[in-house]
Amino acid sequence: MNQELTTNPFNPVAPVKTFDEIKVSLASPERILSWSFGEIKKPETINYRTFKPERDGLFCARIFGPIKDYECLCGKYKRMKYRGVICEKCGVEVTLQKVRRERMGHIELAAPVAHIWFLKSLPSRIGTMLDMTLRDLERILYFENYVVIEPGLTDLTYGQLMTEEEFLDAQDAYGMDAFTANIGAEAIREMLAAIDLETEAEQLRADLAEATGELKPKKIIKRLKLVENFLESGNRPEWMVLTVVPVIPPELRPLVPLDGGRFATSDLNDLYRRVINRNNRLKRLIELRAPDIIIRNEKRMLQESVDALFDNGRRGRVITGANKRPLKSLSDMLKGKQGRFRQNLLGKRVDFSGRSVIVTGPELKLHQCGLPKKMALELFKPFIYSRLEAKGLSSTVKQAKKLVEKERPEVWDILDEVIREHPVMLNRAPTLHRLGIQAFEPVLIEGKAIQLHPLVCSAFNADFDGDQMAVHVPLSLEAQLEARVLMMSTNNVLSPANGAPIIVPSQDMILGLYYITLEREGLPGQGMIFGSPEEVEHALTAGTVHLHSKIQARVKQIDDEGNEIYKRYETTPGRVRLGALLPLNAKAPFELVNRLLRKKEVQQVIDTVYRYCGQKESVIFCDQIMTLGFREAFKAGISFGKDDMLIPDTKWDIVEGVRDQVKEFEQQYMDGLITQGEKYNKVVDAWSKCSDEVASEMMDEISRDRFDPDTKEQMEPNSVYMMAHSGARGSPAQMKQLGGMRGLMAKPSGEIIETPIISNFKEGLTVLEYFNSTHGARKGLADTALKTANSGYLTRRLVDVAQDCIVRLNDCGTENAITAEAAVNDGEVVASLGERVLGRVAAEDVVDPASGEVIVAKGELIDERKADLIEQSSIQSMRMRSPLTCEADEGVCAQCYGRDLARGTKVNVGEAVGIIAAQSIGEPGTQLTMRTFHIGGIAQGGQQSFQEAGQEGKIAFRNANLLENTSGEKIVMGRNMQLLIVDGEGAERASFKLGYGTKVHVAEGDKVGRGDKLFEWDPYTLPIIAEKSGVVRFADLVSGISVREETDDATGMTQKIVSDWRAAPKGSDLKPEVLIADPETGEPVRNDAGNPVTYPMSVDAILSIEDGMPISAGDVVARIPREGAKTKDITGGLPRVAELFEARRPKDHAIIAEIDGYVRFGRDYKNKRRISIEPSDETMEPVEYMVPKGKHIPVAEGDFVQKGDYIMDGNPAPHDILRIMGIEALADYLINEVQDVYRLQGVKINDKHIEVIVRQMLQKWEILDSGETTLLKGEHVDKLQFEAVNEKAIAEGRRPAQGEPILLGITKASLQTRSFISAASFQETTKVLTEASTMGKRDKLIGLKENVIVGRLIPAGTGGATQQMRRIAQERDQKVIEQRQAEAEEAAALAAPMAEDVFEDGGDMADISMPESRD
């Protein structure tokens, strides 16, 4: 596994022993001394005159080893032959200078010192161990207070703090020897040493059994955990206080002479020097028997200097160097982006690499890249030298060097030989997904720029405006093989994020392909008939027919049996030309290209060719259509001038119409019919509709077919329209700004400015409009910079949480599965069932409901054909395997994961699916963040206020609850009513959720056609509607306390608005509500359940009625305003994704009913309302919720709610979904929410990537009841550990622990991974390492990150295979060894009765010690 070091003849190194895990624990003073090669007594470093290290100083050669190889300091012994001799004059061992990198020293401290990590890294381990607060500890350590260690017979208590006076008084009162108290780290050390861990643990367990209340058990559990960790790991508590400080090897803290007699030195030397100085001074003071107070001060300073050495700035002032810069301590060396982990272990500089600017290389093949000769010569130097030597052109490396420097002709020939078939890797930063590094075969070119194939640009996200790329050379044969097989650009046609081709033409190529497939009326040669593509080419060359003429041609095709046939097609010469490039295949017929090809269609063509004709064919095809696209675009000469931007004639009419509308809204507002917020919303809506209308007029005009009046030929479409329509460049949104109207702008805060920009760029903006537009433009640019960073950080967290998710086995054999159904958003299907199950494994047989035949068998991978069958049948949902439910112990299994999207086949064992998932989710984040500003902050989207039918069918209601008001409108009164459109067979075609207060325009059983209005709602306010008729009575709606009257300055109208009554002094116990009374009796009207009809009011509700007014059922009692329209773009999107993956509880989150039952309102508590649910099932306990007063509660007393219903609106907290509705519901919620954000941007990501991340978030279980196990209540443990402990408990007949799965955010989950190395390299390094060392954690080196850090092959891909072979070999060896041992024992037993003395050393067994295999 570890690459064995090559043995140097001068320095035969023993091969590195392979290891399986790394354990970290506390170092005892004896351990530190055993590492050390000597004590450092002096603070001197080197003699500034002779530059030789001072003896016993920080660079002492006697302790750390010689400065020059095989030479002692005084020069008495030189050369190899004295190896291992210790010079009697200077005491230096004659050996390699390299040992100065590995030999450590130590400093004997004159007084113990607390280790700052265990003191200050929260929670303080020393504090927990002693059950003292951090403040008290610091008082003792920094010599402010004494602490009682042994109270004796006095009435003092153990651990009591005393000031100096109190201490002296106590000594007077009780006598000197009656009790022991001490101060400083010595006191702490004594207390820690006195702890007997086993009795302490027993005592704590006993306490825990008796403890009651909330806080006490928590505290005990914390201590118990720590004590048990110490017991298990074999650490002693007193080792957290240092008596010996280790000194790291001098070469790791070098001192470099600069010119001019100055020195550059590592900060550590300064920090060590301070420690040594203070330590020596303290020793001297103790010898001199100095007064206590001086010694104490010196001890405090020693403590501070050791603190600074370990973690500068953690406590007290930061210690600065000569130039006022804080010194870098040992902790700083590890932490952060510049620390050891991220700078040197996870990211390294690479030998044999170069970088240069990229230019386009359209004449390259897909697997090639152009490499400048200069670069190639430099990169392949060693290969050239060896080849020169082999050919006998040079006898030494020096000669070869000269030849290469002179660039002799034979060198170039050799370079060509060397480079042939030797792939190189190209990388463009930022490498956001694995396609950011691909392998190509180099082609030598003149010049200094790297040439890149145009088709791979979209994978690298590269353009040629000055981008740079790096070249890396794979050296070993294995590396070249992997580069060719796995990383070659031709092997990465499909994107791992969604399985669609990523090698797609873009921009000019698309424009060319669009142009060549155009079809126009009345061109020369229309109606001609051709017998073969060759004839068409002749006619084109002769000019008798135009590229776009409508003709008939005969094209060679292949039928399903594989025979060649000729078929006639109505087509154009251009399409025939394109069709000639298609590989002959029944599944790729000419119809594929016999249409107008836009970007989407081209992608589909490539996809089809790849799926059915194989990789080789499709790569050749891609290269050919690239060449064709470029050539045709160049020949078409499409370009545009300013007159190609058409401004519709109707623009000003539309604008005038909307202006009148807006005036009317202003007037309504003045008359007080609508509120300020409503006016704003209506105005914004009107303008955004106007803007869309102008844009669509413009698009209609620009896309209209035009005919030449003289020749009656159809003219070419408008150039701008062709570019946008084909998907080459530009978009309708940009065309709208150039030729329509610029539209509404958003302020930096995200609100929309009411006045739109009516001009477009062609007309030019007025000064005021220009000023308004600067808002959005600036926001766009600022956002871009910020979001790039945020998105990168999101990707980093995702990679960290998912890095150890690898496909480890073929099938875990689980019966669990999740249900897949089509994704519906706002009633339209955004992802069909077929799309969602494609590439998954069915968990049970899928049966066609019509015919009853099995479409997909259980355990079968669903490919495109099967997915199409599922689509055609009327199946609504099916069960499929998912990474979420996979039961593999480590990683996931291939069956649960399904298809490897980038290859189109079942995923291979060893694929790092976690990292691919993280990249697939993170990469578009950055893409999108870089793209917001192209629209320049234009406000998008007015509010939708009605829903039209998307297809024909019959109406059906679910959970119907309708009320008809006086004007005959049907109003929804229920919370979870759905409207369905069903087709003739009764299969559901669309479904809509109807919110409370929606007006429904259709009745059950109605037939509807496309575009019929189904229902409408008020998008800006949430109404409260009377369910019975009667007279209004106000309760607790006191003017000035719970109601404020707002007079609008503009209109003079007043409105009654419910204000926040809790803030008022007298309002604490009010319950503002509106009652409906019977006009005859004055009694409150009762509803069907028999409860009085009351409407509790929430803050900011606007009352629509007066006290004492008559009201009829269906009228509005009050309106609650919703937030205004905010603009939607991924700025809202990226934080939303991060929020979902971090599993944060949203502010004002929804409250979800945990059980089925009836709603009851309990007694109010301070400013919360108490809602309880009485279960319909008698055996269960009622559940209570507290809701802040003044929040609108959609349920009423006596309503029946089902488990999972919302009792309070808002975004649900994912933890609640998991707890109440289970893992599958949580997965559905997270997948849909994340997908919604990406869909808004038109980014496709496969669901399984999100599932893999969610799986990683669900690894831990929280213990609810510890049973009779060692697990503690409230502890988070791994699912595996939880199950193992319980199995053991059950086997021994004890009560198992109870637990439930919990959801951890990705940051939390990364910090709680099994591997402490991985967690430490992610964030909070000191905290992670402190915890790991007290627990004596073992890192099993399972994930990728920890293996990269310790410098091994990663256990994925080819590295995983080697690891498996090693494991098998070990198991075999083990068997052989056991067999031999058994045989030897038998032989020994036969040979001699005294087996002991025969087998003293284990015979020949002793030399075959295998490292423990890891099961």
From Swiss-Prot:
- Which BP terms from GO are recorded? DNA-templated transcription
Q: How is the cofactor bound?
A: Binds 1 Mg(2+) ion per subunit. Binds 2 Zn(2+) ions per subunit.
* Nucleotidyltransferase listed as a keyword: yes
SMART domains registered for this protein in UniProt: RPOLA_N
Q: InterPro entries from the xrefs?
A: DNA-dir_RpoC_beta_prime, DNA-dir_RpoC_beta_prime_bact, RNA_pol_asu, RNA_pol_N, RNA_pol_Rpb1_1, RNA_pol_Rpb1_3, RNA_pol_Rpb1_3_sf, RNA_pol_Rpb1_4
> Per the UniProt record, which EC number(s) apply here?
2.7.7.6
The main enzyme category here is transferase
**Keyword list, A-Z:** DNA-directed RNA polymerase, Magnesium, Metal-binding, Nucleotidyltransferase, Transcription, Transferase, Zinc
**Residues binding Zn(2+) 2, per UniProt:** C812, C886, C893, C896
**Identification of the protein by name:** DNA-directed RNA polymerase subunit beta'
Q: What is the protein's species of origin?
A: Dinoroseobacter shibae (strain DSM 16493 / NCIMB 14021 / DFL 12)
Query: What gene, per UniProt, encodes this protein?
Result: rpoC
